A protein has these predicted regions:
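Nucleotide-sugar-dependent glycosyltransferase catalytic core
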Residues: 176-177, 203-227
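Active-site nucleotide-sugar/metal-binding loop of Leloir-type enzymes
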Residues: 65-81
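Short, flexible, basic/aromatic active-site loop/helix in glycosyltransferases
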Residues: 114, 130-149
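Conserved donor NDP-sugar-binding/catalytic core segment of glycosyltransferases
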Residues: 94-127
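Short beta-strand-to-loop acidic/aromatic patch adjacent to the donor-nucleotide binding site
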Residues: 79-90
Length: 297
């Protein structure tokens, strides 16, 4: 198919079987990418055998943001669109075709994420069946760039290459790089619109294998958002950005974790998250908060 070249980038760690099935989903796309990069911090995480067909493996520093940037720096300059997928995605075969076609027709849009018709607590088989059966999304494409859809969702994102090369992901966000999609979205908005595209669809399995601990995740949730405020990266101007931080980021998150803990919903380690939340708050009060402190927990 004619059109701009596409490069797909997947950052992964310790999830070889999950990655293999996601690569199969990518190969079923009606519009294929010119390059598929798998970015790892160790060759132990790299695919092998039939999974490597058409795949370029890159090894670099660990962490979601760092691994993505390793790949971005290797993408040839004639590639117009870079696409990011988590390693636990199942895509409708039309995802790439619909997403890139929309960007080609709308020059004022710099980046999009698709719409997830399911997000978490779903098997690969159920995801495939759902994508075959659910056609509610079909029709004329529309970009949703208001409310909760105003930023990218990094499990799936299609971004114009030129502005992305100028921004990159923030490598001060280590490990799982919590909030990197929100932060990048706000910096990309100076180049154009960012939003969610109605007819680029998929399922995010949210497989928990090899994710960071609850304590680290809880720390990052608070500390990373505080870091964004200190950088001046927020969709709400001060002082309301700080009000949002207290009410939505801190108090709401603590309340949700307490509810999950007392109700026995322990899949995501709510008690560990609460510990991390509280450590982050103490660090903020003591003036030592940093996203990289997660490495010490």
């Amino acid at each position: 198919m004619e059109g701009g070249k596409i490069a797909i980038i997947i950052a992964t760690k310790d999830r070889l079987e999950i990655l293999r099935e996601t690569l199969q989903s990518i190969r079923r796309q009606t519009r294929l990418a010119a390059y598929v990069y798998v970015s790892v911090s160790s060759l132990e995480d790299a695919p092998s055998g039939n999974s490597t067909e058409g795949v370029i493996v890159l090894v670099g520093p660990p962490g979601g943001s760092a691994q993505r940037n390793t790949a971005i720096r290797q993408v040839p300059l004639d590639v117009e669109y870079m696409v990011f997928f988590d390693d636990d995605m199942e895509l409708h075969p039309s995802y790439l075709e619909n997403a890139v076609s929309f960007l080609e027709k709308n020059s004022d849009v710099v980046a999009i994420s698709g719409m997830m018709i399911a997000d978490g607590n779903i098997s690969r088989e159920a995801a495939r069946a759902l994508l075959e059966q659910d056609t509610a999304w079909a029709g004329d494409p529309s970009l949703r760039d208001r409310g909760r859809h105003h930023t990218l969702y990094a499990c799936n994102a299609v971004i114009r290459s030129r502005p992305l090369r100028q921004t990159l992901f923030d490598e001060n966000l280590p490990l799982y790089s919590y909030g990197e999609d929100y932060e990048l979205s706000l910096r990309l908005k100076k180049f154009g619109r960012v939003g969610r595209l109605s007819n680029a669809v998929g399922v995010h399995l949210q497989t928990q294998a090899a994710r960071v601990s609850g304590k680290r995740y809880g720390y990052a949730m608070i500390a990373n958002n505080w870091y964004f405020l200190q950088k001046g990266v927020c969709h709400i101007a001060a002082p309301w950005s700080y009000v949002r931080f207290v009410l939505v980021i801190v108090l709401k998150r603590l309340w949700i974790n307490l509810q999950n803990g007392f109700s026995g919903q322990l899949e995501r380690d709510p008690w560990g998250q609460i510990q991390g939340n509280l450590v982050a708050l103490v660090d903020i009060i003591c003036g030592r908060s940093s996203p990289r402190r997660i490495l010490d927990l």
